[in-house]
């Protein structure tokens, strides 16, 4: 796939395809508080885009708009457009169930359900699809294979998932997210609660998964963003300050705020 030329200007739209998610004039409000301000961003298909910035800058808020998780809470409002494959997912006509099957999400802390390893992976499938037992077995195995967990758990699928290590639990959460065969995978600080060895394994997994999925990751770890992402967006106080190729952001940022943040002068 041809690499996408991304301009240094935060608000300049991408002009080269393929684009998986296109954000147009996006604003977000917690009641009367404006958390995101006129965000314009294009996220390329089957690449890793990292969102960085200090706590409270809006990066996790932006990530969670991509699957409309905010709809669970009152007095939260998104304005503008978020186009997934050309369709505005913020439209009331866009089904939440359809969106959740297309966009998987993994959170900061591993949250396996208190059930077997098998049932953790099968849980979402049962709510969205009807299939035979053999088809379900194949789908569960495929998800565990893709999350690099199959060889470790194939002989204990009926054991409680809470018995897995922290790193295994997070890979199980990834398996659960991709079991529905989404096209987008959202990762909200997926390694912040893990040890260095588990973190390294998750980072290797991200590199493997981007051949199949468009990945957006929120991270406070500058080194991690530099290692795993193809593109990086720097956010500050609800604004997207700069968005470019990761190597450019970390070596030749165009905005002083970006340079100050990645060099540790603030944040």
Curated annotation (Swiss-Prot):
It holds the Pfam family ABC_tran. It catalyses: phosphate(out) + ATP + H2O = ADP + 2 phosphate(in) + H(+). GO terms for molecular function: ATP binding; ATP hydrolysis activity; ATPase-coupled phosphate ion transmembrane transporter activity. It is an enzyme of class 7 (translocase). One of its GO terms (cellular component) is plasma membrane. It is found in: Cell inner membrane. It comes from the Bacteria. One of its GO terms (biological process) is phosphate ion transmembrane transport. Keywords: ATP-binding, Cell inner membrane, Cell membrane, Membrane, Nucleotide-binding, Phosphate transport, Translocase, Transport. ATP binds at residues 53-60. The keyword Transport applies. Its EC number is 7.3.2.1. The keyword Thylakoid does not apply. PROSITE patterns: ABC_TRANSPORTER_1 (PS00211), ABC_TRANSPORTER_2 (PS50893), PSTB (PS51238). Its main location: membrane. Belongs to the ABC transporter superfamily. Phosphate importer (TC 3.A.1.7) family. Part of the ABC transporter complex PstSACB involved in phosphate import. Responsible for energy coupling to the transport system. The complex is composed of two ATP-binding proteins (PstB), two transmembrane proteins (PstC and PstA) and a solute-binding protein (PstS). This is Phosphate import ATP-binding protein PstB. The gene is pstB.
């Amino acid at each position: 796939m041809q690499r996408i030329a991304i301009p240094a200007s935060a608000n300049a739209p991408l002009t080269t395809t393929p684009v998986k998610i296109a954000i147009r004039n996006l604003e977000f409000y917690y009641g009367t508080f404006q958390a995101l301000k006129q965000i314009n961003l294009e996220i390329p298909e089957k690449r890793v885009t990292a969102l960085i910035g200090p706590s409270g800058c809006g990066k996790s808020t932006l990530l969670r708009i991509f699957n409309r998780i905010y709809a669970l809470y009152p007095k939260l409002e998104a304005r503008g457009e978020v186009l997934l494959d050309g369709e505005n997912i913020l439209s009331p006509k866009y089904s939440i169930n359809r969106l959740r099957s297309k966009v998987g999400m993994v959170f900061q802390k591993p949250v396996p359900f208190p059930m077997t390893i098998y049932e953790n992976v099968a849980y979402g499938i049962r709510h969205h699809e009807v299939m035979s037992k053999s088809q379900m077995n194949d789908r569960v195995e495929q998800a565990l294979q893709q999350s690099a967990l199959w060889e470790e758990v194939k002989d204990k699928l009926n054991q409680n998932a809470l018995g897995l290590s922290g790193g295994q639990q997070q890979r199980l959460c990834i398996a659960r997210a991709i079991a529905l065969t989404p096209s987008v995978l959202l990762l909200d600080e997926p390694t912040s609660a893990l040890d260095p060895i588990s973190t390294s394994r998750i980072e290797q997994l991200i590199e493997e998964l981007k051949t199949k999925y468009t990945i957006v990751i929120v991270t406070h770890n500058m080194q991690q963003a530099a290692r795993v992402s193809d593109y990086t967006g720097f956010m500050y106080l609800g604004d997207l300050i700069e968005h470019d190729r990761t190597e450019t952001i970390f070596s030749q940022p165009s905005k002083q705020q970006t340079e100050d943040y990645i060099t540790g002068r603030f944040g």
